[in-house]
Amino acid sequence: MRPRLGQAIPASHRVRLLCSLLASSCVASFAPTAFAQASTSTDELKAQVAQMRQQMEAQQQVMQKMQQRLDELEAKESAQEKVSQAASTTPATPAPSRVSAAPLVATASAPEPSKPAPYRPPSAPAGVAEPLPEGYVRLGDTGNLLKLDLVAQLDTMIDNTYMGSSDLFVPSSIPVRGQPFYGSGWRTNLSARQSIFRMDFRRDTDYGTLKVVYKNNFFGSGTGDMPYNMQFFYGELDNPYYTLLAGYNISAFTDIDVFPNTLDYEGPNSFTFKYGPQIRFSPVLYRSGDSKLTLPLSMEKPNADITKIGNYSPYSRLADFTLGLRWETPNWHIQWANLFRDLGMQDSTNGHTQRTTAFASQLTGSTKVFDLDSAQAWFSNGHGYANFLQDISGLGLDAAFTSNGTLRAIRARGWGVGYTHGWTETLSSSASYGYLRISPTADMLIDRELPKSTKFASLNLAWQFSQRAMLGIEYLWGQNISLEDMRGQGQRVQTTLRYDLNP
């Protein structure tokens, strides 16, 4: 086939053309020699013939090499034609992604739900429960996964009287008759202290899943509108046989799963709630399907809350210890927890000490009632655990000196209930009630204006108007009765707007 004008000549055609030219030159060199045979002698003719043979042998070797090259080129062109024909009939394959070895969003190693995520009512506190499986990010090739959650929340509060803690509803801070600010009238406050920053790290190890959790809000003791307050900073090793936790976390005496769904951060007065450094070991004693029996054990930092008298200051020789038993099923759970404490006072001048022991027991439980309804309940009783009770923590009521100079733990008890009703999956109401009482003996040297008993009640309506936003309103009522039987009541209406980035 002859190439058209301007068309490139294939390599095989060029080789054939070169072979033809060599053959022509060979014939041309032979013709003059034949005509010269008549005028030359026999010896000269033989010499010319020998020379011509050498030239023809050399040219034959060149032609063999060129033929070999021609065969190689033809084979290569044939292979290229087959590839081009296959490419024209096969759909194009998309180019591979430049980053495929370590995807940013983790799926295979991230916790994957084996069943639908549990229902969370709109009024549920943010950043408390185990985070949802979605939203983890892989940190390169380290094997670590990270989930970040930011919660921005604004609470608007209108009180009918002075509250000792304006950002929290604390019945023990309500003034009673005869105290300053009693019946002081309405006041308004805005707070963003329930805003949260939380980080959940996790990775797989030979011993199970290792989790490291960090969380803070802004209910610190510093000055300003947003004082920093760390809530969680702990590591936890989780496997089918046990969990081992170490760091800063809620006390093992607390059952956070029965905390009612209040918009107010403080919650019921009688709920046991305390943070601190600890080590916690929870072996699994028995399993039956999705249900299990565990034995939570913990050693926690002691924090004796006793009012200073003279040169005496509170201290503890031993750590706080807890021992519990928990039965948990997919729809309900019950927990029995016990607290053991060592409380002491020491004179800074002569080193004289007074010590007493403290013990408390608590029974808690929650259950799913209907598809969107749940109920919670708790009861605690003991001596020397006032620092674990929401309403009287920090008031120095763990223990007190008697009139004869003996240190004794103060008895306290509290109970409460909560109920959440889901009108729809995005609209819910929660109600709760709590009662708390302390019973110091008559000869104890404590301030008689401190609370003897308090009551708490709440009712709210919360609307999850988008996947990441909630709007709610809550009514709160509280009563404070002092050791002198003076009474005071307070009411609050709170509205809450919350944005939760990655629950």
Regions found by a protein language model. Give the residues of each.
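Outer-membrane beta-barrel "beta-signal"
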Residues: W463-F465, Q489-P503
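Detector for outer-membrane/organellar transmembrane beta-barrel domains
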Residues: W327-P451
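Outer membrane beta-barrel
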Residues: P133-S172, V176-D305, R317-H333, S366-F370, ...
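Sequence/structural signature of outer-membrane beta-barrel proteins
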Residues: D159, D204, N217-T223, N249-D255, ...
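N-terminal signal peptide c-region/cleavage motif recognized by signal peptidases
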Residues: A31-T33
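Bacterial N-terminal signal peptides
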Residues: C19-S29
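N-terminal periplasmic/intermembrane-space "pro-region" immediately following the signal or transit peptide
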Residues: R2, F35-S165
